[in-house]
Amino acid sequence: MKKAGLLFLVMIVIAVVAAGIGYWKLTGEESDTLRKIVLEECLPNQQQNQNPSPCAEVKPNAGYVVLKDLNGPLQYLLMPTYRINGTESPLLTDPSTPNFFWLAWQARDFMSKKYGQPVPDRAVSLAINSRTGRTQNHFHIHISCIRPDVREQLDNNLANISSRWLPLPGGLRGHEYLARRVTESELVQRSPFMMLAEEVPEAREHMGSYGLAMVRQSDNSFVLLATQRNLLTLNRASAEEIQDHQCEILR
């Protein structure tokens, strides 16, 4: 019993340290790097010179930019042209806010252009990390390849994913996930952030503790994946963990 108690105490200490490291990462100057790129470089250059550089695309009227990430050959980031920190922002559950996940899905074409040939939809994934699972304080959705093992697991669970948020059997990458099937028409009309906030009990009050991902299924539906921070299981809710920025799935 004493050993079990000691082990539990050690796990708590590790969890607290992990949380502290996550907080430390978000308090330095480097956590504002993406925001500075968007607001001080991409947006002004587009407005003054009709050149989105260093971004790949700038859409001021639509409220977003697309930037090639330095990590991985095909990874891109979709970000707002104004200040939104991350999943904790109440703006994401405001109906007037752009549907960033849908916009990010449209931006997957940048992967194909960079690759030099079409990247199959089944190889693409979108992900945004929780407040403690991210390293940047500017909202950004990762547009990148899906891990082959995650792709296989989702394919195998196609029949188990319904139009309600339910636990995904076995979770992903050692962490618990909720999964929800959505059609393209649903996705166009309603943001995944709103679906999560309105349909999962108490999620609205704790949106910053969630990481969210999206993948296309073989039946042309989409699956939304949500994981919530749980420091006792060392889950910082970094939904980006389902992605493979080296794109092994294309080899």
UniProtKB/Swiss-Prot annotation:
Listed under GO biological process in this entry are: CDP-diacylglycerol catabolic process; phospholipid biosynthetic process
Which keywords annotate this record? Cell inner membrane, Cell membrane, Hydrolase, Lipid biosynthesis, Lipid metabolism, Membrane, Phospholipid biosynthesis, Phospholipid metabolism, Transmembrane, Transmembrane helix
Catalytic activity reported: a CDP-1,2-diacyl-sn-glycerol + H2O = a 1,2-diacyl-sn-glycero-3-phosphate + CMP + 2 H(+)
Report the pathway entry. Answer: Phospholipid metabolism; CDP-diacylglycerol degradation; phosphatidate from CDP-diacylglycerol: step 1/1
- Ranges annotated as spanning the membrane: 4-24
**Membrane disposition:** Single-pass membrane protein
Q: Where in the cell is it found?
A: Cell inner membrane
Instruction: Give the SUPFAM superfamilies listed for this entry.
Output: HIT-like
InterPro entries linked to this entry: CDP-diacylglyc_Pase (IPR003763), CDP-diacylglyc_Pase_proteobac (IPR015993), HIT-like_sf (IPR036265)
The record's Gene Ontology cellular component field reads: plasma membrane
**Tagged with keyword Chloroplast:** no
Q: In the Enzyme Commission scheme, what number(s) does this protein have?
A: 3.6.1.26
Q: Name one Pfam family in it.
A: CDH
The primary location reported for this protein is membrane
- Judged by the first EC level, this protein's enzyme class is hydrolase
GO molecular function annotations of the record = CDP-diacylglycerol diphosphatase activity
Instruction: Tell me the HAMAP family matching this sequence.
Output: Cdh
Family classification: Belongs to the Cdh family.
Give the protein name, as stated in the record.
CDP-diacylglycerol pyrophosphatase
The uppermost taxa in this organism's lineage are: Bacteria, Pseudomonadati, Pseudomonadota, Gammaproteobacteria, Enterobacterales
